[in-house]
From Swiss-Prot:
Amino acid composition bias (Polar residues), ranges on this chain: 485-505
UniProt-recorded name of the protein: 5'-AMP-activated protein kinase catalytic subunit alpha-1
Cellular component annotations (GO), alphabetically ordered: apical plasma membrane; axon; chromatin; ciliary basal body; cytoplasm; cytosol; dendrite; neuronal cell body
Reactions listed under catalytic activity: L-seryl-[protein] + ATP = O-phospho-L-seryl-[protein] + ADP + H(+); L-threonyl-[protein] + ATP = O-phospho-L-threonyl-[protein] + ADP + H(+); L-seryl-[acetyl-CoA carboxylase] + ATP = O-phospho-L-seryl-[acetyl-CoA carboxylase] + ADP + H(+); L-seryl-[3-hydroxy-3-methylglutaryl-coenzyme A reductase] + ATP = O-phospho-L-seryl-[3-hydroxy-3-methylglutaryl-coenzyme A reductase] + ADP + H(+)
GO aspect biological process, one term: negative regulation of TORC1 signaling
Record keyword Nucleus present: yes
Stretches assigned to the Protein kinase domain: 27-279
Biological source species: Rattus norvegicus (Rat)
The keyword Membrane is assigned to this record: no
Ranges where the record places region Disordered: 484-536
InterPro entries: AMPK_C (IPR032270), AMPKA1_C (IPR039137), KA1/Ssp2_C (IPR028375), Kinase-like_dom_sf (IPR011009), PRKAA1/2_AID (IPR049020), PRKAA1_UBA (IPR028797), Prot_kinase_dom (IPR000719), Protein_kinase_ATP_BS (IPR017441)
UniProt-reported outcome of changing S496D: Retains activation ability
Length: 559
């Protein structure tokens, strides 16, 4: 689950009413499609042409609070350049003093997730067609140094002709390697073993694993790794053993096993998949066009000029990046994007101009078991640019670094905040966990392992989602020692372990102070408990122990 910022009022100077609806630029905003970290996604309609778009609204205050201004400014320009038939396009960015509106491609077919839930598994031919489209989009972004890291059927949309469109490319670029699990609010069913175990990973290989899970879902209508008990689910993923129905083609089984290799070094690459016999069958040429742009020594003058105009830089800067083969530099990425866009538009012209849909989904099979529950949300993209969003930071202050985002696992409630925290304290006491009250809505909890005598630690924090709903967020704090040493927190000596009455009393005092309801119920934690901490490495899996604590607590609270 995610921490949701309050929906703030936007400046009236840039926003107008149109027949009772909000108008941004030439777009009239309609219903809300989803809610994400920085704001909402709404459907929009161009007042002149009538074309529908999806408008993602990024809240400026939320962006500043997460210290990602620089990342968003540098990435938006390149995401605007992304032009691939199977990736959701970003058309325009409109700014107001309080919000940023990203005008994106709207598709009417809904999520692939919903389609599978409604219709069940697809036949092999249709599964291959959609998987080829998805992998083409993944390959396109990997070649331009962007990794998705949260691929799943919820992030694959379907257009009116039942073609796949990948959404939310670019989100992961605002996060450091190895940190994405703590920021992801999606289901862990699609996560690679190295992600859920907290090991470092380069990036592309986790997209391969997730693509393999999607392929399995297309073919079988279920997931290869699934369990209601999260620790058991994690064990299944890390073991990499999954059931293969008898109706599956042996050729596709071999591909699935190669893509779902636990060892990332043995896992299939995109090149391996493209060379697989099952994948190559009926493969449209436009999905993987020849790519001479990287090996060519010739410079495209038109592309060079366009990069200079968009980034307000000199030709020498761009040429320096190209000649030094610094492909990760935003200037080089933009140059190659422009080259690729031109080539793909030429080679896929028939695709863009097609007026008749491909063969419809004709499979009559249905889901044999329900899909894992998910939280409905849309994640805000974070593309690269140099000048598009300078107004985000008029003082152009330098940030000290990206604040570490948190992964949210929790439960929702419509009870009063003090009642929620009182029940939490009772549950903790019943489980014989130890806890400390950091503030009325933030607890730090630990459990002693009777076998190893080591402690598993977690934090519980309450947030307000909307006017009636609250989110109790669970977070592992096994990294507290590292944070303290790195200076991200100021350790102070802990007092005695807090009891239930202190939690309830503090909560009542906080309510009496009249805290504003539109923000989270507590401020950021700035100190850590330094009472006897375990500096020595602990055996076993911290992640599994954390989820066991979560499961035990949720079980008590649900009684």
């Amino acid at each position: 689950m995610r921490r949701l910022s309050s929906w703030r009022k936007m400046a009236t100077a840039e926003k107008q009413k149109h027949d009772g609806r909000v108008k941004i630029g030439h777009y009239i905003l309609g219903d809300t499609l989803g809610v994400g970290t920085f704001g909402k996604v709404k459907v929009g309609k161009h007042e002149l042409t009538g074309h529908k778009v999806a408008v993602k609204i990024l809240n400026r205050q939320k962006i500043r609070s997460l210290d990602v201004v620089g990342k968003i400014r540098r990435e938006i320009q390149n995401l605007k350049l992304f032009r691939h038939p199977h990736i959701i396009k970003l058309y325009q960015v409109i700014s107001t003093p309080s919000d940023i509106f990203m005008v994106m491609e709207y598709v009417s077919g809904g999520e692939l997730f919903d389609y599978i839930c409604k219709n069940g598994r697809l036949d092999e031919k249709e599964s291959r067609r959609l998987f080829q489209q998805i992998l083409s989009g993944v390959d396109y972004c990997h070649r331009h140094m962007v990794v998705h890291r949260d691929l799943k059927p919820e992030n694959v949309l379907l257009d009116a002709h039942m073609n796949a469109k990948i959404a939310d490319f670019g989100l992961s670029n605002m996060m450091s390697d190895g940190e994405f699990l703590r920021t992801s609010c999606g289901s862990p069913n699609y996560a690679a073993p190295e992600v859920i175990s907290g090991r470092l990973y380069a990036g592309p290989e986790v997209d391969i694993w997730s693509s393999g899970v999607i392929l399995y879902a297309l073919l079988c209508g279920t997931l290869p790794f699934d369990d209601d008990h999260v620790p058991t689910l994690f064990k299944k993923i890390c073991d990499g053993i999954f059931y293969t129905p008898q109706y599956l083609n042996p050729s596709v089984i071999s591909l699935l096993k190669h893509m779902l290799q636990v060892d990332p070094m043995k896992r299939a690459t995109i090149k391996d998949i493209r060379e697989h016999e099952w994948f190559k069958q009926d493969l449209p040429k436009y999905l993987f066009p020849e790519d001479p742009s990287y090996s060519s020594t010739m410079i495209d003058d038109e592309a060079l000029k366009e990069v200079c105009e968009k980034f307000e830089c000199s030709e020498e800067e761009v040429l320096s990046c190209l000649y030094n083969r610094n492909h990760q530099d935003p200037l080089a990425v933009a140059y190659h994007l422009i080259i690729d866009n031109r080539r793909i538009m030429n080679e896929a012209k028939d695709f863009y101009l097609a007026t008749s849909p491909p063969d419809s989904f004709l499979d009559d099979h249905h889901l044999t078991r329900p899909h894992p529950e998910r939280v409905p949300f849309l994640v805000a993209e974070t593309p690269r640019a140099r000048h598009t969003l300078d107004e985000l930071n008029p003082q152009k202050s330098k940030h000290q670094g990206v604040r570490k985002a948190k992964w949210h696992l929790g439960i929702r409630s419509q009870s009063r905040p003090n009642d929620i925290m009182a029940e939490v304290c009772r549950a903790i006491k019943q489980l014989d966990y130890e806890w400390k009250v950091v503030n009325p809505y933030y607890l730090r909890v630990r459990r002693k392992n009777p076998v190893t005598s080591t402690f598993s630690k977690m934090s519980l924090q309450l947030y307000q989602v909307d006017s009636r709903t609250y989110l109790l967020d669970f977070r592992s704090i096994d990294d507290e020692i590292t944070e303290a040493k790195s200076g991200t927190a100021t350790p102070q000596r802990s007092g005695s372990i807090s009891n239930y009455r202190s939690c309830q009393r503090s909560d009542s005092d906080a309510e009496a102070q009249g805290k504003p309801s539109e923000v989270s119920l507590t401020s950021s934690v700035t100190s850590l408990d330094s009472s006897p901490v375990d500096v020595a490495p602990r055996p076993g899996s911290h992640t599994i122990e954390f989820f066991e604590m979560c499961a035990n607590l949720i079980k008590i609270l649900a009684q």
